[in-house]
Amino acid sequence: MIGKYLSWFMLAFLFGFVLESYRVQSQDLNPTEKEVLSNMLDFLQRHSRTTYMFPLLSESKRNSELINSLLGAPRVLNNAGR
């Protein structure tokens, strides 16, 4: 059991080290590479265990955007019917 957690920790540490070294060179990235890296980090953030225990601010922002779009929907539909 401990070996499983240790292997996950080592994998996360190695991945973090690689990302940190990649971040240092981020000035040399083209927009496509930045988008791929952003998508990969977003995926890891959504699927990591800590996001279930401690929700991040980005999730609340997404929720507020959803609420704002739903509250604005009747106005848009009303304007479209005119």
Curated annotation (Swiss-Prot):
Gene Ontology MF annotations: hormone activity
Modified residues (Alanine amide): 80
Record-level GO BP terms: chemical synaptic transmission; response to light stimulus
Domain of life: Eukaryota
Keywords, sorted A to Z: Amidation, Cleavage on pair of basic residues, Hormone, Neurotransmitter, Secreted, Signal
Free-text tissue specificity from the UniProt record: Expressed strongly in the head and weakly in the ventral nerve cord. Not detected in the midgut cecum or hindgut. In the cephalic neural complex, specifically localized to cells within the optic lobe, anteromedian protocerebrum, accessory lobe, tritocerebrum, and subesophageal ganglion.
Stored Pfam families: Pigment_DH (PF06324)
Subcellular location, principal: secreted
Cross-referenced InterPro entries: Pigment_DH (IPR009396)
Signal sequence range: 1-26
GO cellular component: extracellular region; synapse
Record localization: Secreted
Family: Belongs to the arthropod PDH family.
Protein name: Pigment-dispersing hormone peptides
Source species: Armadillidium vulgare (Pillbug)
